[in-house]
Structure formats: structure tokens, C-alpha cells
From Swiss-Prot:
Alphabetic keyword roster: Apoptosis, Cytoplasm, Mitochondrion
PANTHER family: DNA DAMAGE-INDUCIBLE TRANSCRIPT 4 PROTEIN, DNA-DAMAGE-INDUCIBLE TRANSCRIPT 4 PROTEIN DDIT4
Highest classification ranks of the organism: Eukaryota, Metazoa, Chordata, Craniata, Vertebrata
GO molecular function: 14-3-3 protein binding
Composition skew (Low complexity), residue ranges: 7-22
Pfam families, A to Z: RTP801_C
Gene Ontology, cellular component aspect: cytoplasm; mitochondrion
Family: Belongs to the DDIT4 family.
Protein name as it appears in the record: DNA damage-inducible transcript 4 protein
GO biological process: apoptotic process; dorsal/ventral pattern formation; negative regulation of TOR signaling; response to hypoxia
Compartmental location: Cytoplasm; Mitochondrion
């Protein structure tokens, strides 16, 4: 038995050793293997982090950026606003023979556009929207304010807020020089009746009818 063991040891000592040229190759292969393992662990870690982020976003609340109320689009409300603006223009035209005492009233398209924007802006926070508006139209003339008309947007609804639009006459720029071109004579009166043109700027005064909050005044 001892002879066999000695013989076995002798045979192992006599076996050819691994060439030294293979050692660097094995070390290189081992380093590549470690790099692959490290890369695999990094990918798994990123995948776990992404998965945990998805899980937390699914289980938790969804973050929604702040959006102001004026940024919401309501087609029905916008269509109603266009109708109200047209009604305002019609009432102003009818007022030329009454409180305004003029032969012609020129209403700039830009003024109507600004009024429409202000109507949407001031009614967006109201419980009934623009339908709950009671609109007073006034025109500043000769140092005083003349009431031209009052419009209940929905006459079957109790108004929730009152909106007073104080319009101004255009007395600047080219208009005073060409105003006479629009002046006419009424058959009922030989006196010359002047033509008026509204300015694009106006004042909006809002008062809530269901609250004791202070008046909101905006220069537009």
C-alpha cells in the first residue's frame, strides 16, 4: 500500500506542468468574467430600482402639475361667451339713440375680443360659470357714467355674480381728426349728431352676490 502511494506521488510529480503562457490567458479570462458579473449586477440593480420606482408610482398618488382654472377648456362655455359678446355689441348699438345720443357708434373688434376674454376669466371660478352672470354695460361720457344696458345671461337662473363693464370713448390718436366724417344729421332733428368710437380699454368690476367678499376691479 505504501509502495502504491509512493508510486502515485511519483507519477503526479512527473506529469507535465501547465505551460506558463496559459496563466496570463486564464487570468485575463477571469478578469473578463468578473467584469461581466459586475455589469450583470449593475443591470439587475438598475432594473430593481426602476421596478421599485414603478411599484411606488403605481401604489402611491400620481403627481399632476398645477394647472390654473383658466387653462381648462370648456367648449360649451366658450360658445356661450361668443353669444354674450354678440348680445353686448347689439345692446351698445341700440344705446346710440338713447343714452349715448350719437348718430353712429363704432365698436372695435379688439374691444369685443378683450371683453370675451375677461368674461371667461371672471366666470371660471363661479359655481354656475358664465350663466350666473348679471352684466351691466356703462359708458363714460362727458365726465359721467351712463348706463347703457343690463344683460342677464340666463334669465331663468338666479345670478351668482354681477359684472359691470365700464367702457370708455376713444379720444386719442387719429379718431378726433376724422370723427366729423362719421357725423350725420337726424331727420327728426336738424342739429348735428356726432359719431362716437369706443376705446379698446375698459374697466371690469365684479361683485359676488352670494358672498360678502370685496369688489374685484380690473383695468383691461
Amino acid at each position: 500500500m505504501q509502495d502504491q502511494l509512493i508510486s502515485s506521488l511519483s507519477s503526479e510529480d512527473s506529469s507535465p506542468s501547465t505551460p506558463t503562457s496559459d496563466a496570463p490567458a486564464k487570468r485575463l479570462s477571469w478578469s473578463k468574467l468578473m467584469q461581466k458579473l459586475h455589469s450583470s449586477q449593475s443591470l439587475d440593480s438598475d432594473s430593481d430600482n426602476h421596478s421599485s420606482t414603478d411599484d411606488s408610482s403605481d401604489s402611491g398618488s400620481i403627481c399632476i402639475p398645477d394647472v390654473s382654472q383658466s387653462e381648462f377648456f370648456d367648449p360649451t362655455e366658450e360658445a356661450l361667451c361668443k353669444e354674450v359678446v354678440q348680445l353686448i355689441a347689439l345692446n351698445l348699438t341700440d344705446a346710440k339713440d338713447g343714452v349715448l345720443h350719437c348718430s353712429k357708434l363704432l365698436i372695435p373688434e379688439k374691444l369685443l375680443e378683450h371683453i370675451g376674454q375677461e368674461l371667461v376669466h371672471l366666470s371660471v371660478s363661479e359655481p354656475c360659470g358664465l350663466r350666473g352672470a348679471l352684466i351691466d354695460l356703462c359708458v363714460e361720457q362727458d365726465g359721467s357714467c351712463h348706463a347703457a344696458a343690463q344683460i342677464a345671461v340666463d334669465p331663468y337662473l338666479v345670478p351668482t355674480f354681477q359684472l359691470t363693464l365700464v367702457l370708455r370713448l376713444d379720444s386719442r390718436g387719429l379718431w378726433p381728426k376724422i370723427q366729423g366724417l362719421f357725423t350725420g344729421r337726424s331727420p327728426a332733428s336738424p342739429a348735428v349728431r356726432r359719431a362716437l368710437r369706443l376705446s379698446t380699454g375698459f374697466r371690469a368690476i365684479k361683485r359676488k352676490l352670494y358672498s360678502s367678499e370685496e369688489l374685484l376691479i380690473e383695468e383691461c
